[in-house]
Amino acid sequence: MPFLLAIDQGTTSSRAIVFDHEGQPIARAQKDLVQYFPGDGWVEHDATAIWEDSLAVAREALDRADVAAHAISAIGLTNQRETAVLWERASGQPVHNAIVWQDRRTAALCRELKAQGHEALVRRKTGLLIDPYFSATKIGWMLDHDPVLRRRAEAGELAFGTVESWLLYKLTGGAVHASDATNAARTLLFDIRANRWDEDLLALFRIPAALLPRVVDNAGRFGETLPGLFGAPIPITGMAGDQHAAMVGQGCFTRGMIKSTYGTGAFALLNIGQTFVESRNQLLTTLAYRLNGQSTYALEGSIFVAGAAVQWLRDGLRAISSAAETQVLAEAVADTGGCYMVPAFTGLGAPYWDPEARGAILGLTRDTSLEQVARAALEAQGYQTRDLLDAMAADSGTKPLALRVDGGMVANDWVCQFLADITGIAVERPRVIETTALGAAALAGLGAGVFASPADLGGQWHRDRLFTPHMPASRRESLYAGWVQAVRRVASDLR
């Protein structure tokens, strides 16, 4: 029986899952990743830890599955997107901590570039906005703050990659420097219509072309692991950014299908087919996936803080000891008593794009309880999702009939039901909620010939539970109106 190994490198942890050829998880391993916060709004990772942890969990998953390397048909890689890694080609060692997608240190530069009128060019070529979220200004910051690094980059001595590119480089012993199209599309340097690195964008952000990896499809033969890593070489045949892998894992291969993933942040992607559509409502246009050289596009809404709000209750306030407690707390009260949490810890994402916004809990009274604050943290995920779905409906002209959800938060039944209630559409939770890893494994299977076509991948999806809206429309709109007012008080551009 062929097995597939998915390595899923995320913002707060690295995990690996062994799947069988029917898409069922056989064994998994996970290790938390330390985050560093060296300045206000700054977020970094140790790139060496990313590599070492990813290798360790892959080995552990194989051990737990009792599967030898020669029985693994292929490896699929998926990763936190936009996070920028810079390393020395000769040694394979990082020259700076990885700057994480959440990092806002380049907000002033982004404002300056917008004021100079560059955003129209960026939107036309990349489908993105000028924002610290994306990789280009992170790379530029590293080069500008160490003149030696800029000189070495221009001389071709350094390499840039998003996390999947970094892992591919390390797994192959430096033999392959490549990035998949979905990750390249998140850098602000890649023209997603022409499918190439763009000279105008490289000049705008002052990024030397010598840094850049070769761009490949999401499925194909990219290289193989060094024999010593797992006991035998394993082909690496699938790569995608985490949200794109989740789209594959959710079987969203038809125009109009939509998925939303709830992890540290939350990300909704709507399949819009093979025609580029520029958003009029502050969404991103991005690659859903690229197979056999053919691009499929998506509208994306990015929420910077989802599960991180619950982590803050646990680790920051120490109000709870585990994320699972939030469901019990939320169910213990009938409502939040007018309390809203706007979790803009690192600014607001779509559709506001306000890097200066900061989080707030509004509507507090002497009677506000921990249960109500916990419920407000969970409700915020529904309100933010409603923001995105309304913008998508305005751009596409149609409202989706169902929302496929995944990620750690959707194990919480209360969250899924509130999502259905506040959006007014059905919410579908799959049997395998680790759909990011499943999508990476499926792409690896496609690249290795285990699956013949994307249609075979869609057959891997099975529904666990359907949540339908129960909330009266008047109540839904009243709650959402309160959210809109809360955001208005937090967002710097709306005050």
Curated annotation (Swiss-Prot):
Keywords: ATP-binding, Glycerol metabolism, Kinase, Nucleotide-binding, Transferase
InterPro entries cross-referenced by the UniProt entry: ATPase_NBD (IPR043129), Carb_kinase_FGGY (IPR000577), Carb_kinase_FGGY_CS (IPR018483), FGGY_C (IPR018485), FGGY_N (IPR018484), Glycerol_kin (IPR005999)
Catalytic activity: glycerol + ATP = sn-glycerol 3-phosphate + ADP + H(+)
GO cellular component: cytosol
Pathway as given in its UniProt record: Polyol metabolism; glycerol degradation via glycerol kinase pathway; sn-glycerol 3-phosphate from glycerol: step 1/1
Enzyme class: transferase
Activity regulation information from UniProt: Inhibited by fructose 1,6-bisphosphate (FBP).
Residues annotated for glycerol binding in this entry: 81-82, 133, 242-243
NCBIfam families on file: glycerol_kin (TIGR01311), PRK00047.1 (NF000756)
Protein name: Glycerol kinase
Organism in which the protein naturally occurs: Rhodospirillum rubrum (strain ATCC 11170 / ATH 1.1.1 / DSM 467 / LMG 4362 / NCIMB 8255 / S1)
